[in-house]
């Protein structure tokens, strides 16, 4: 089978290519240039070239910087401007890795696209990985349903520690096996505010309000805050921790309150991404990557919006983040929180 493998120069994508090549597939590597971070690509491309030569496979360098800027980078900036919390990895997977890269794979005549994600596929549904600590099904849940039939995740059945051990036994991979893992947003050097600083003044002090609308302090600029944050602002006379409950970007205000006030039992989604045919779901939902799943009921409307009612309340629900719905270990829907 002819398979395009997304290669980053890291351990996971390298082991993915190695495994598929050893199974006798016709493997082609592809490195994506997504952003202009200084010295980022040169080093990675050298690694990809080294692996490709070792495996004796061809590889391509695909410049997707324009698409990435339009579909991921600028929406990241704009979402923070709106006082919301973006999820750039979910957008990147849908539009870039499982979108533009899949188009490129098809243009080469490839039957499948393989990535180093920790997830599994079964009956055209994404499943959680065997290694729950590394499971990436949450970020893949933004994928177009039609893309799933072309995808392969060879590492989904492996534990991360076994991938590293496997990598350390192969000569060309030995220098990669001890690499620091990349877990942060790829185009953010230190903090997301540094990205926003390139486009606007983020340090415009504003008012801190309590939930009754009373001014109780000052903050350093609304873009420094996300829902649930409890530091970096002043609350006069507070005797208990206060958390950001809401952000008003037009007024440059943040509304704060107690942890109890952060509790939410119901929320709405727009443009729900369904992987099964349904108008109602009785399932579990994750409201952020590392959160535990919570039992819920989902009502889906004609305009693809949805209302979610939680069995138990959650804390710190952030508009702009992705909610992912599971039936046991299978992803059945996703959508961005309003």
Swiss-Prot record:
UniProt GO molecular function: ATP binding; tRNA binding; tRNA-uridine 2-sulfurtransferase activity
Span list, region Interaction with tRNA: 134-136, 288-289
Subcellular locations according to the entry: Cytoplasm
UniProt-annotated catalytic positions: 92 (nucleophile), 186 (cysteine persulfide intermediate)
Family: Belongs to the MnmA/TRMU family.
CDD domains: MnmA_TRMU-like
GO biological process terms held by the UniProt record: tRNA wobble position uridine thiolation
Gene that encodes the chain: mnmA
Disulfide bonds: 92-186
One GO term describing the cellular component: cytoplasm
Pfam families: tRNA_Me_trans (PF03054), tRNA_Me_trans_C (PF20258), tRNA_Me_trans_M (PF20259)
Keyword Lyase tagged: no
PANTHER family associated with the record: MITOCHONDRIAL TRNA-SPECIFIC 2-THIOURIDYLASE 1 (PTHR11933:SF5), TRNA 5-METHYLAMINOMETHYL-2-THIOURIDYLATE -METHYLTRANSFERASE (PTHR11933)
Organism the protein comes from: Campylobacter jejuni subsp. jejuni serotype O:6 (strain 81116 / NCTC 11828)
Top EC class of this enzyme: transferase
Domain of life: Bacteria
Keyword flag Cytoplasm: yes
Protein name, per record: tRNA-specific 2-thiouridylase MnmA
Residues reported to bind ATP: 6-13, 32, 116
Function: Catalyzes the 2-thiolation of uridine at the wobble position (U34) of tRNA, leading to the formation of s(2)U34.
Keyword vocabulary terms for this entry: ATP-binding, Cytoplasm, Disulfide bond, Nucleotide-binding, RNA-binding, Transferase, tRNA processing, tRNA-binding
Catalytic reaction equation(s): S-sulfanyl-L-cysteinyl-[protein] + uridine(34) in tRNA + AH2 + ATP = 2-thiouridine(34) in tRNA + L-cysteinyl-[protein] + A + AMP + diphosphate + H(+)
TM spans (from-to): none
InterPro entries linked to this entry: MnmA-like, MnmA-like_C, MnmA-like_central, MnmA-like_central_sf, Rossmann-like_a/b/a_fold
